[in-house]
């Protein structure tokens, strides 16, 4: 297979030969980026999972498909606090808080996953503006831009067909972007750079596409 465009990008881009992460899972790794600490040191070693997702994961653990087989501690799963009560401890100081106090304009774009209530949301953690990804980030199942490719597994209908657009600005009502979410968030990030080029700013851009 010829991959001339990818080869050209690789030849003219930056090559990262080593990558490091402070945690093996999503949210704790993000907490480490925000605080400069190992998340396990302040009690945030697990990724908060929305209530419906807990049911899905438990269901998958019972599937016969070996590729989806997992292990679920039912006692723990059934006694977790609400998703809305979980997040990075608010006493932790983020880089956004430090830079905001130093006079920087601070903006968050993309996924957050460090809490959405009780002072754990982006704006309470040092960001002046936040264009977030709330929940899933999928198009509607019947969107004309979607090429439907169904799989013979029960999770396909459960997740794909029930997930909707989830862009949200400063905690407002979720809305549908006018383009693919990766393009949308990239374009909005470029606007932040353009609009703030003459003053100190900090942009935290977290795309969803490379996550899953």
Label the model's feature ranges.
Residues 49-105, 112-201, 207-212:
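Formylglycine-dependent
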